[in-house]
């Protein structure tokens, strides 16, 4: 399914792989996450360096963390990169992140399950991913 209900400034949507959540695409280079009207609906950012990406719900990306980075479709979720800590990945404080695959750990490929975020180092070598 394609979504066309992106917020102002976003371009018409396009479809990504069926293995991804429904998402909207913006023209590259991507400047910020593209949020749909409801905080419960999916959002995404597809930059020129990221051909396609899976996106997590907008409720997991507070407005203050609008700058997002994309990971390959095979990795599953995107991670939130806070402007104030560019060398860190923002992961939940009150719940454990879930590592997707071992090949993604060097990118900090973790999926938060709640919206309260804290900055942790990107470099993680243990199975719990930080």
UniProtKB/Swiss-Prot annotation:
Region annotation (14 X 5 AA approximate repeats) ranges: 10-128
Highest rank taxon of the organism: Eukaryota
Pfam family, one: Keratin_B2_2
Tissue expression notes: Expressed only in the head and back skin of a 3 day old mouse. Not expressed in adult skin.
Sequence repeats: 10-14, 15-29, 34-38, 40-44, 45-49, 60-64, 85-89, 90-94, 95-99, 104-108, 109-113, 114-118, 119-123, 124-128
Keywords: Keratin, Repeat
GO cellular component, one term: keratin filament
Assembly mode: Interacts with hair keratins.
Role according to the record: In the hair cortex, hair keratin intermediate filaments are embedded in an interfilamentous matrix, consisting of hair keratin-associated proteins (KRTAP), which are essential for the formation of a rigid and resistant hair shaft through their extensive disulfide bond cross-linking with abundant cysteine residues of hair keratins. The matrix proteins include the high-sulfur and high-glycine-tyrosine keratins.
Similarity-based family: Belongs to the KRTAP type 12 family.
Name of the protein in question: Keratin-associated protein 12-1
